[in-house]
Amino acid sequence: MGVRRAKPKNFFETGGKVNEFNGCSLLLSNRLTTRYRKINIMTEQQHIVGPDQIFFSVTDDKGVITDSNSVFESISHYLREELLDSPHNIIRNPEMPGGAFRLMWDALESGKPFIAYVRNMAKDGLPYEVLSTVTPLEGGGYLSVRTRVSDPEFASKIWWLYGETRGKEDELLGEGKNRRETAEIGAQFINDKVSDHGFVDYEDVQRFLLPHEISIWEKNASNEVVAEGRLAPVSKAVGELRTEEENWSDRQDAMAELAAQLTSVGAKIQASLARTADLKTQADVWSGKLTPMEAIPLNVAVSLGSIVTEYVDDLQKRLQALRGSIEHVRSTIALARVQTHCLAAFVREVAEDSAGGRKVVSMKTLTSALTTEVEAMGKNVAQYGTNLSRCERRLQAVLSLIEIPQQMIMDWLKSVQEFGPSVDMPELISAVAGEIESSASMVDELNGLLGRLGTIEQKSPRHMLDLLHTVDAEVRKLQV
């Protein structure tokens, strides 16, 4: 486990009192602190969260701990009595940037969940790393569920970013800015820097992070159910809920793949229309030599292509909206899966070591939070269905419009090949033939993808809500 090591106080730990340092030593301290964070943030001795461990804590609106499970107590090395009524930052690691927590509170205060890699500190001074999800509770307060970090390679990029952010925050504190200002600047720094890893902002990171992490973590998760005793009905219903969530997740993964393919084909359509416009440029070179029967079809095809371009641009926007709604649904499902695993693990914990009414209340809290997520999933699914219908209609319109200029170009080539060109123009004929072949393949691909859109079943999460009502009813029986 390791022994707590004495650490020299740095600027942050002394509360930011500038008068304790002269300018030179402060600058040196900040540089060394930043370097320490960047180099050692992944190499320090630490507590390891087990591959199937999952733990939770509940706080009030001010972040004071009101409940937890035994796994949290074990990993944090705090007794339950020490955790209860303590601020949640009792486990805060000073290496974590204030900007990360500013992002968290901004999300929570707007009613949104928050997902992040977090480096906490146990009572003995050693860190432990987790994937943390925090969600607002319907009756007030927050639920945080944590698992181990399942993708250390991706996490290393975030740890490095945290180190950079803390270094920047220390500099700002040294310049006399207060902690609130510093955290706000740190949050913006994180939001901006995630673009280095291909993300739009930190919300974009969250939409990727949770489905990605939970899919890896679940490979080691326990699917054991409580077969006997008063908790058996609860455990059975939770197990059925987990199966239903897996089916939902599989459907959304397939839909996400299809949406990505559609977006790719949409880009191909845009490229095809650009090539059709290039044919007009090539035809203009021969404008004085082509007969009207040779020039007019190409000019009309290009003119129609410009109209199709507007439809294709709109299609791309709708496909992006569809992908966004799919990502929201996938993220919501992933959050529900995390909370379901947490509930299942806690039911097993209660079955092994019952602690009376207190743990029944905890189960009610977990069930209520999970119900909120599934209800949110229903709203996201409704938006997803709307976006899907719009994409289908726009795809059908684009396909219908593409056929007209495509047919005109095909007729032009057929006529030239049958009756011969009025002038020798092999480059133009070759370009037209190549575009016909390319666009035909693209249209076939688009028709195939359009057909697949209707094969992916879209369902309401009603069955999941029914299962949760069963869980809630069984939990209430335990209070009798």
Ranges and model annotations:
Residues F11-F12, F21:
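Aromatic (phenylalanine/tyrosine) cluster motif
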